[in-house]
C-alpha cells in the first residue's frame, strides 16, 4: 500500500507513535489510509451541512474496512463575493484548493481519497488535485439546493434575486416584492438550484466518471444522498483493489463526454474554463476547437434555470443525469460508452437502466431545443483565441451594435444603473481577465441589472472576465487574448460596431486590420491593479482563459 511509507518497518516507529496519538491501533496499520477531503464552511450555504456529511463518509469508510482521516479546504461563495473585491479571489481560490489538497495528501501518503465538494471553485479545485495526485478517488458532492417559492407562489432562485435588484432599480417591482424574492430565493442548504456553475461542475464530475450516478442531481436534503455516501466508500475500496486512478478515468474521451452533457444541458460557461484546467492536470492536449466540435454534434435537450423555470430537482425527478446520457447515447458518435468510471463499471453499464420520466424537462433527440449544443465557442478578430457564449440562455442569435466601453465591472454597473446603456448597445467590460482583474471576476451583477431592467434581449455584453452560471442574455465572456495581454478588446473605442453571430460562431469588430494595428502600437498596458499578496502573485503567473487560466511554472533554465 502507498501508506506503508509512513506505517511499515522498524524505522517508522516515530510515525506510528504519532498516528497512535490520533487514536489508531496496531491493527489499523494493515488497512488502507483514506483522505476525506471536506470543504465544510459555515458562510457558504452549499457547504454548511458538509460537517455532517464528513461524519457519514468516515463511518462508511470504516465500515468498508479502511481508516479515514478528514481535513478541510478553503472555499469562496461566489454569490456573497459578487460585486466587490471578493470576486477577485474566487477563481484564484481554485488553485489554492488544488495546491492544499495536493499538499496534505502527498505529505501523508494516503492510499485513496473521497472528496466532498459542492460549490463553484471547490469542485474543480479538488478535481484538479485528484488528477495531479492520481490516487484512487471518488467524489460525492453536497447536492443541489431546492428552488424557492415566493408568497405569490412564483418559483425563484438566486438568479431571481440578482435580477430583482435590477427590476427594483428600474421601478418594475416594489421594495416589498424584492424582499419577498430575497427571503425565498435560497430556501435550503445546497448548491444554488439552477444550472449554475456549481451544479454544472457536479454534473460534469458524474459524467467524467469521478463521481457516482446521482451525484449531480440528488438534492442536498434528500436521504438518497446518504446512500450515495455509503456507495462511495464501497466503490473506493474496489478502485484501490483494482488500482483504478483518476487519470485512468479522465481521458480525452471522458472530457468529450463531459462537454457533450454540458452542451445537452446548456451548462455554465465556467465549465469551459475548469474542464480545460482539468485537461492540463491530466496531461491531455485539449483545446477550444475540440469543444466547438462537440457543440456541433450534440443537441440541446434540456433547459434549466436561468434558461427556463426548471431546476435541478426537476432534472432529478425526470431521471437525472443518467437519463440525459441514455437519451444522448441513442445518437451515434456522441458518447464514449465503454470507458471506465468510479463505479468500477463502464459508462454504458452505469446508464443501462436509466429512462426519461418527464419529456417536458428532458427532451428527446427527436424534439431538442436546438440541433446543436447550449454553449458555443466564438472566434474572430475580437477573440482570436476564442470566447464563450451560453447560447441556450438567449433566443437572439445575431446582434450588431455600437460599443459602450467600461474598464471595470464597478464602472459598468454604475453606468448601467445610471442609464448610460440603451437598447441596441454592446456593453464592453474589459481589464477583468485572469491577469487584468486579476482573478477573472464574474459579471453577474451587470447581466442581472440588464435583465432586470428589461433589456436582456436588446443589449449585448462582452467581457474578458467570466459570467456566473446564473447569467443569461447575449453575454459573451472569456474573450482571449484578454485586454491586459493586449488583446483586441483593449483596442476598442466608444462607438465601434461589434457583430455577434451565434450561428456562424463569429465575434467581430467592424474596424480594419490597419486601424487595429495602429491602435495596438499606441496602446499602453495599464499598471496592475494589485501588486502584493496572493492576487499580485496570481496575476504574474496565470495563463489565458483559453488554456483554463491555470498557473504557469516559471522556466528556471
From Swiss-Prot:
Q: Which Pfam families match?
A: ILV_EDD_C (PF24877), ILVD_EDD_N (PF00920)
Query: What InterPro entries does the record point to?
Result: Dihydro-acid_dehy_C, DihydroxyA_deHydtase, DiOHA_6PGluconate_deHydtase_CS, ILV_EDD_C, ILV_EDD_N, IlvD/EDD_N
Q: Which Enzyme Commission numbers does its entry carry?
A: 4.2.1.9
Q: Which UniProt keywords apply?
A: 2Fe-2S, Amino-acid biosynthesis, Branched-chain amino acid biosynthesis, Iron, Iron-sulfur, Lyase, Magnesium, Metal-binding
Gene Ontology CC, one term: cytosol
How is the cofactor bound, in the record's words? Binds 1 [2Fe-2S] cluster per subunit. This cluster acts as a Lewis acid cofactor.
N6-carboxylysine found at: 121
User: Signal peptide: which range, if any?
Assistant: none
NCBIfam families in alphabetical order? ilvD, PRK00911.1
Q: What does this protein do?
A: Functions in the biosynthesis of branched-chain amino acids. Catalyzes the dehydration of (2R,3R)-2,3-dihydroxy-3-methylpentanoate (2,3-dihydroxy-3-methylvalerate) into 2-oxo-3-methylpentanoate (2-oxo-3-methylvalerate) and of (2R)-2,3-dihydroxy-3-methylbutanoate (2,3-dihydroxyisovalerate) into 2-oxo-3-methylbutanoate (2-oxoisovalerate), the penultimate precursor to L-isoleucine and L-valine, respectively.
Family designation: Belongs to the IlvD/Edd family.
Give the protein's recorded name. Answer: Dihydroxy-acid dehydratase
Which species does the entry assign this protein to?
Answer: Bacillus thuringiensis (strain Al Hakam)
Amino acid at each position: 500500500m502507498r501508506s506503508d511509507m509512513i506505517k511499515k518497518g522498524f524505522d517508522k516507529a516515530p510515525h506510528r507513535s504519532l498516528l497512535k496519538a490520533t487514536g489508531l491501533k496496531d491493527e489499523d496499520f494493515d488497512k488502507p489510509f483514506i483522505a476525506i477531503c471536506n470543504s465544510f464552511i459555515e458562510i457558504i450555504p452549499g457547504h454548511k451541512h458538509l460537517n455532517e456529511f464528513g461524519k457519514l463518509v468516515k463511518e462508511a469508510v470504516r465500515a468498508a474496512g479502511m481508516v479515514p482521516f478528514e481535513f478541510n479546504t478553503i472555499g469562496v461563495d461566489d454569490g456573497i463575493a459578487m460585486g466587490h473585491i471578493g470576486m477577485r479571489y474566487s477563481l484564484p481560490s481554485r488553485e489554492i484548493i488544488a495546491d492544499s489538497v495536493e499538499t496534505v495528501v502527498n505529505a501523508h501518503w494516503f492510499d485513496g481519497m473521497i472528496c466532498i465538494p459542492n460549490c463553484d471553485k471547490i469542485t474543480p479545485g479538488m478535481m484538479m488535485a485528484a488528477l495531479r495526485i492520481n490516487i484512487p478517488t471518488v467524489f460525492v458532492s453536497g447536492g443541489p439546493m431546492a428552488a424557492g417559492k415566493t408568497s405569490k407562489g412564483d418559483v425563484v432562485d438566486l438568479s431571481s434575486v440578482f435580477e430583482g435588484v435590477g427590476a427594483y432599480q428600474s421601478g418594475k417591482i416594489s421594495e416589498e416584492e424584492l424582499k419577498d424574492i430575497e427571503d425565498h430565493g435560497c430556501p435550503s442548504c445546497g448548491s444554488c438550484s439552477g444550472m449554475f456553475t456549481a451544479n454544472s461542475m457536479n454534473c460534469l464530475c458524474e459524467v467524467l466518471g469521478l463521481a457516482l450516478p446521482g451525484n449531480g442531481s440528488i438534492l442536498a436534503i434528500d436521504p438518497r444522498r446518504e446512500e450515495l455516501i455509503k456507495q462511495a466508500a464501497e466503490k473506493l475500496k474496489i478502485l484501490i483493489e483494482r488500482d483504478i486512478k483518476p487519470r485512468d478515468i479522465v481521458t480525452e474521451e471522458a472530457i468529450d463526454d463531459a462537454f457533450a452533457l454540458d452542451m445537452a444541458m446548456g451548462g455554465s460557461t465556467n465549465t469551459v474554463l475548469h474542464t480545460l484546467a482539468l485537461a492540463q492536470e491530466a496531461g491531455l492536449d485539449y483545446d477550444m476547437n475540440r469543444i466547438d466540435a462537440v457543440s456541433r454534434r450534440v443537441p440541446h435537450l434540456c433547459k434549466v434555470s436561468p434558461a427556463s423555470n426548471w431546476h435541478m430537482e426537476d432534472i432529478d425527478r425526470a431521471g437525472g443525469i443518467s437519463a440525459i446520457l441514455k437519451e444522448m447515447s441513442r445518437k451515434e458518435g456522441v458518447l464514449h460508452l465503454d470507458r471506465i468510471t468510479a463505479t468500477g463499471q463502464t459508462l454504458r453499464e452505469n446508464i443501462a437502466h436509466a429512462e426519461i420520466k418527464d419529456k417536458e424537462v428532458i427532451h428527446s433527440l427527436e424534439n431538442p431545443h436546438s440541433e446543436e449544443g447550449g454553449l458555443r465557442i466564438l472566434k474572430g478578430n475580437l477573440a482570436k483565441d476564442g470566447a464563450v457564449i451560453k447560447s441556450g440562455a438567449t433566443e437572439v442569435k445575431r446582434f450588431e451594435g455600437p460599443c459602450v466601453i467600461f474598464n471595470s465591472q464597478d464602472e459598468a454597473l454604475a453606468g448601467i444603473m445610471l442609464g448610460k446603456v440603451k437598447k441596441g448597445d454592446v456593453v464592453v467590460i474589459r481589464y477583468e481577465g485572469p491577469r487584468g482583474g486579476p482573478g477573472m471576476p464574474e459579471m453577474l451583477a451587470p447581466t442581472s441589472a440588464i435583465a432586470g431592467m428589461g433589456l436582456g434581449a436588446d443589449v449585448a455584453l462582452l467581457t474578458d472576465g467570466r459570467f456566473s452560471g446564473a447569467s443569461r442574455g447575449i453575454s459573451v465572456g472569456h474573450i482571449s487574448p484578454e485586454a491586459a495581454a493586449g488583446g483586441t478588446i483593449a483596442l476598442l473605442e466608444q462607438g465601434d460596431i461589434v457583430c455577434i453571430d451565434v450561428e456562424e460562431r463569429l465575434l467581430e469588430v467592424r474596424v480594419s486590420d490597419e486601424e487595429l494595428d495602429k491602435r495596438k502600437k499606441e496602446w499602453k498596458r495599464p499598471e496592475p491593479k494589485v501588486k502584493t499578496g496572493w492576487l499580485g502573485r496570481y496575476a504574474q503567473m496565470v495563463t489565458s482563459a483559453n488554456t483554463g487560466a491555470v498557473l504557469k511554472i516559471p522556466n528556471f533554465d
